[in-house]
């Protein structure tokens, strides 16, 4: 068993203090000072134990003790120290010299504890909800959505923005220019009939003295060459239209014949025509072969 309390000894008085006992205790403390509480009962003749004398002086009789309601500043200190020190009321009272540990303990148990719980409950009710942290599943779904959206954006991009598409477009443009050049060369080839027409006109000057049949044949040749020039043009559209494949082959064939006639036998034909005109005979229809 533990040590028995001193108040349980025989001849020790319990209960509330009387005013006479308070006066005796205050007189002794003023004369000797607070400290040696074991000598107080023997020196003063009080029928109280040393602990009862100490608590009576500390909590009631010492000067500077403040009574009454606690200020908000004192309440804040008590709440803060109680959270740090716990229920060590004597240590808490050392930070509030004007308050006793007994008063602080009673005020905490009767007022502050209930008030603090009420404030915490109200704060929990009216506090804004905390943003929930995304779980692993939500993060994966969000990452999947972002990847899908990026793929969709790449798919929605125009095809001509890729290098392969640029090469295809370049090839198509090159083919188009090649076709245009081919058409230009073909048009120049079958427009060569105009130069042949000029040659026929030139030869017509030498053939003025010849007979009318030769003139008619030359006229037919000119009409044939001019017909070749007029056919490629569309009068309805008003623009140059490409001749069909068969006509193009015929025109290329005629152009080769005309080149041969113009390049190789022009001089020979002129000489023969001059001889035939001078001799009275005309063989102009040879130009048609």
From Swiss-Prot:
Residues 37-61, 89-112 bind DNA. It is found in: Nucleus. The keyword Transcription regulation applies. Disruption phenotype: No visible growth defect but increased cell walls thickness and higher lignin content. GO terms for molecular function: DNA-binding transcription factor activity; sequence-specific DNA binding; transcription cis-regulatory region binding. GO terms for biological process: positive regulation of DNA-templated transcription; regulation of lignin biosynthetic process; response to auxin. CDD domains: SANT (cd00167). The keyword Cytoplasm does not apply. Keywords: Activator, DNA-binding, Nucleus, Repeat, Transcription, Transcription regulation. InterPro entries: Homeodomain-like_sf, Myb_dom, Myb_TF_plants, SANT/Myb. Residues 127-162, 225-252 are annotated as: Disordered. One of its GO terms (cellular component) is nucleus. Residues 9-61, 62-116 form the HTH myb-type domain. Residues 139-154 have a biased composition (Basic and acidic residues). Mainly expressed in highly lignified tissues such as vascular tissues. Pfam families: Myb_DNA-binding. Transcription factor that binds to the promoter of MYB31 and MYB42 and activates directly their expression, thus repressing lignin biosynthesis. This is MYB transcription factor 69. The gene is MYB69.
């Amino acid at each position: 068993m533990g040590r028995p309390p001193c108040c349980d000894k025989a001849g020790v008085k319990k209960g509330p203090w009387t005013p006479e006992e308070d006066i005796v205790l205050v007189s002794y403390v003023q004369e000797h000072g607070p400290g040696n509480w074991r000598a107080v009962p023997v020196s003063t003749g009080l029928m109280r134990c040393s602990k009862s004398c100490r608590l009576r002086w500390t909590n009631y009789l010492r000067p500077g003790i403040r009574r009454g309601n606690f200020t908000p500043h004192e309440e804040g200190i008590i709440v803060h120290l109680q959270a740090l020190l716990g229920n060590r009321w004597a240590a808490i009272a050392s930070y509030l010299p004007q308050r006793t540990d007994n008063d602080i303990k009673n005020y905490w148990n009767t007022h502050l504890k209930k008030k603090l719980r009420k404030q915490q409950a109200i704060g929990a009710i009216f506090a804004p909800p905390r943003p929930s942290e995304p779980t692993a599943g939500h993060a994966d779904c969000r990452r999947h959505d972002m990847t899908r959206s990026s793929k969709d954006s790449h798919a929605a991009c125009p095809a001509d923005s890729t290098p392969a598409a640029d090469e295809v477009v370049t090839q198509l443009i090159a083919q188009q220019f090649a076709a245009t050049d081919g058409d230009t060369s073909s048009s120049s080839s079958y427009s060569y009939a105009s130069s042949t027409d000029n040659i026929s006109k030139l030869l017509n000057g030498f053939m003025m003295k010849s007979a009318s049949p030769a003139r008619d044949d030359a006229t037919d040749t000119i009409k044939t060459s001019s017909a070749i020039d007029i056919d490629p043009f569309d009068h309805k559209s008003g623009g140059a239209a490409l001749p069909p494949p068969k006509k193009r082959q015929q025109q290329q064939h005629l152009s080769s014949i005309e080149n041969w006639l113009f390049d190789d036998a022009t001089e020979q034909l002129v000489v023969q025509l001059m001889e035939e005109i001078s001799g009275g005979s005309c063989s102009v229809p040879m130009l048609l072969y």
